[in-house]
Amino acid sequence: MHNKDKLMRCMYSMQTRLGEKDINLPQYYNNRELSWLDFNYRVLQESYDKNNPLLEKLNFISIFSSNLDEFFMVRVAGLKDQVKMGYDKPENKAQMTPQEQLDAIKIKNTDYVNTQYQRYNELIKELANYDIEMVKPEDLSDALIEKLEQEFKLSVLPTLTPLGIDAYHPFPKLNNKSLNIFVDIDTEDAINSAIVQIPSLIPRFLTLNEGTKQYVVMVEDVITYFINYLFTGYEVLNTFTFRITRNADLTIHEDGAEDLLIEIERFLKERKSGSAVRLELDCRTSEKENVEWLINQLEIEDNDIYYLDGPLDLTFLFGLVDHLSHKLKYLTYEKYTPQPPRSLGNKNIYQLSLERDIFFHHPYESFEPIVDFIRQAADDPNTIAIKQTLYRVSKDSPIINSLKEAAENGKQVTVLVELKARFDEENNVHWARMLEDAGCHVIYGMTHLKTHSKIALVVKRINNELTSFVHLGTGNYNDKTAKLYTDMGIITTNKDIAEDAINFFNYLSGYSTKPEYNKLIVAPYDIRDVFIDRIDKEIRSHLQHGNGKIMMKMNSLTDKTIIEKLFEASQAGVKIQLIIRGICCLKPGIPGISENIEVVSIVGRLLEHSRIYYFHNNSEAHIYLSSADVMTRNMIKRVEILFPVEDKSIGQRLVNYMNLQLSDNQKGRYQDAQGLYHYVENNSSPLNSQSYLMQEAIKYGEELKKQSVQPSGQPVHSRRGGSWMRKLKNTFKR
């Protein structure tokens, strides 16, 4: 009775304190778009890290540019559409209107992009120490210019088509992210203009060797230098290079679509020619009159224009690093190949999962057992059915091949291929058709929802009984990105989860109303409700026992409903530790609001992608893994799965992992009460959590090797190799 009275008094006291603070004030929140720009700047910071090899620093600069392209194509494009429609309602956190957001984006991003180009120019100069020089054609010797001219005539000139601009030739429809050269020509009768679009399929740079030196020349500089080949008989007066980014956030018309595949294909064609949202120009461009004309043709504003001190589109550095890494391997990361999973060892994945849950932590641990999980099922005559969701897969996916083989072997194969996975639509349309041709039953997703869940179900007949094996994960079934993204997964034969998995796939197939689940929590809506319930229970537990604690690891936090609950928990005294790699709309450490909340972002060699949710519950912890971030879109616009971790040893690994990341003083940045990020500084020994986990995984792999055991998965040694980030072009967005 005494404890109950104490609890009621504490709750009344908390409610009184809550009434004194208005948690809706905009100064307690970060704007989503500006928070994303700050994340992208943390990516750029990696190009300054003295512990990163030179070529990897260049890769981070390239990633920064690749990220920005998508940001403009989707987020900026969406804001511009709102402004055009006259929508001026502030967003619900930092209370900024669309136009205010666009203005703030321009200011912040201009500063960050200027920093990027400053760093790019510094690093390019460092390459000269290794006999690699970026040059203009006019800087080359006569002999090298002659070689360059031959290469231009052989490999570049045949691909170019000048597009005249006059009364008979209107302004051409230039492709999204295309690189173009504007040309003024004196035709004696008048000064006319033309545009030369540089084909995306030709190399972005050419290389020339002379002695020990290698010269790198940008293809746009080569074309400009030899531009007279395109306009023989005329005098070329001026040229400048420009790049256009277009709106790619177009609407897929699902309602009334007879065939979603056909609608997606129409959408992909439309995306290539959306309205312009950004114009990039070389800062040395002096052709103001032509630039003004171009601006008018593209119907863009001053906020959309960026003058850059170097080559446009620094994503070319992915290719340059790949080229140079063959010669300069010692300027790339020491190669790491994922090790055998500690939870699996040398056991058979199906036999062991009948005994206990199996945990996987990629890429420290190999993704190969997950590939084998599907491959073995396809080959096993005891397999009755395979069901799987696919959101993003590699272009030569072994999982796709196994699913096709399974169907050809007479198994019942059901695959949900999410056709609306942004910028993977074309790839997924291809796989959907191929799987259908192989005899798989293919589901295209759910109307107005993206199926982002990561789940695979294998049903086998064992001893005349059907047994279900379920894999649940935080990341995609993509064997390529599984080497670069940190993700987690569990394989289980838990009967409640197996029943849930069966009901989940029936629901996706459209032959079932929304089911009641035993263990799985499924969005839309249910995940948010469970989070609210668990936070409320943690508050009550803390008021009674004084040991409330919440830890969450995710990619982004934007959902205001959950942020408000976290504020409430903080005000009640619950300790909250958030590991958020990207967007964070919550400001921590504000007295009376979020003083008990800590936010840490880790950006490093690997892309942090796991989602873990921990509630202390007076030492009876509830721990979950999920495909979902705490973003509004994940809560209400996607089909997501949150699943409990009930194995105590796996739960402890997750807690240890989060504590390790919170202690990272090399790649960790903490957010202050103003929303600014700072590197974690303490007197502890240097700790890079990603490097630490790599070394621990290698130790385990070596232990298995000493036992002369053939492990499940691929044991790997550490050695130098080519750049890992070449495949990371879209890494830091998802």
Curated annotation (Swiss-Prot):
UniProt keyword annotation of Magnesium present: yes
Any one cellular-component term (Gene Ontology): polyphosphate kinase complex
Location of the region described as Disordered in the Swiss-Prot/TrEMBL record: 705-734
Domain PLD phosphodiesterase: 447-481
Alphabetical keyword list: ATP-binding, Kinase, Magnesium, Metal-binding, Nucleotide-binding, Phosphoprotein, Transferase
Lineage start: Bacteria, Bacillati, Bacillota, Bacilli, Bacillales
Its EC number(s): 2.7.4.1
Domain of life: Bacteria
Encoding gene (name): ppk
InterPro entries, sorted: PP_kinase (IPR003414), PP_kinase_C_1 (IPR041108), PP_kinase_middle (IPR024953), PP_kinase_middle_dom_sf (IPR036830), PPK_C_dom2 (IPR025200), PPK_N_dom (IPR025198), PPK_N_dom_sf (IPR036832)
Binding sites annotated in the UniProt record for Mg(2+): 392, 422
Protein name: Polyphosphate kinase
Active site: 452
